Amino acid sequence: MKNKMYSMLVFTLISFLFYSYLIIWTPVLSVCSEKISFVNLTNFSMWPKFAKFHYESFEKTYIQSCDIPISKNCFKQILFWSFRLSQKKNICLSKINMLYLDNFPRWTLHFEFPTKTNRKRHVYLDNISFLYLVFATLAFKTMDDSCVNKIPFEVLASHLFKINFSQNKIETIFQDLQNHTEAQLFSRENSEQLFSFTNFIYYFVYNRTDCKNSISKFFYNSVNTRNVSTPFGVTNFSLVRGIMSPIQSFKGNLMFLENKTKVTKPTAIPNAVTSEPTKFFPSTRGTSSMQASQQTSSFPTTFFTTNHSNTST
């Protein structure tokens, strides 16, 4: 009888501690606890040493610069799974030091998106674009005021794209992006638009930097131009050669690593502000002020390409 009472007491104590742990730590772990089965990042263990080194260096910088400190494991999951755009905790990354990525080497991430048919949709994404995608989605998806208020959307819209928006209209645009469901987000149109949106963030961060020399080298060779859609309208972006890994150099500026590839054009965001397609001609005038951001004739294009494969799921 005594042993039985002792066992019940121990069981009760363990149960109490366990549920206390859940109550205390569930809000903290919720950001990093979700596993997304429909997005597969391949060959992470096969990355070359230089890629792993820069990944770890960026991880360290990311953790130290983040407004809300996170663990390394949390960073990795946020990095790998941020495509879902469903972080449950407002994490503001507006103060992250993007200058560290000036000379970040190029390597490719490979994502597989299952479709309703027996085919997989493959996306090969440049790592730089992906890191900025993380920055963009975590900053804008949450719509946290402390993040959003640091970015002068009105100035960016009027100065870069010659479009005048009210604050309410801007909030509506990003609310539309926030309200995309997973099915909508990973549709052909929206996933492509998401990369175009990333490109806008890329340019925004690029224009906020004062490290002109190193960045000018990063964007040194610019060839061709193409129209891409952004929440602020359609504009021309030039294609940057960048620093590519050996496997990418075989394909030039394309991110495809397979045969019979097909480049698809971005489409406009549903319910976004409509405007006439606007050609963007960067100014050569340089200044550090946000009202007149530093301009350059070398401008990064959308770092994405997509194709369909007959590989069965």
Curated annotation (Swiss-Prot):
Signal peptide: none annotated. Keywords: Glycoprotein, Late protein, Virion. Glycans are attached at residues 40, 43, 127, 164, 179, 207, 227, 236, 259, 307, 310. The keyword Glycoprotein applies. A long 51 kDa and a short 49 kDa protein are produced possibly by proteolytic cleavage. Its main location: virion. GO terms for cellular component: virion component. InterPro entries: Roseolovirus_U47 (IPR008645). Belongs to the herpesviridae U47 family. This is Glycoprotein U47 homolog. It comes from Human herpesvirus 7 (strain JI) (HHV-7). The gene is U47.
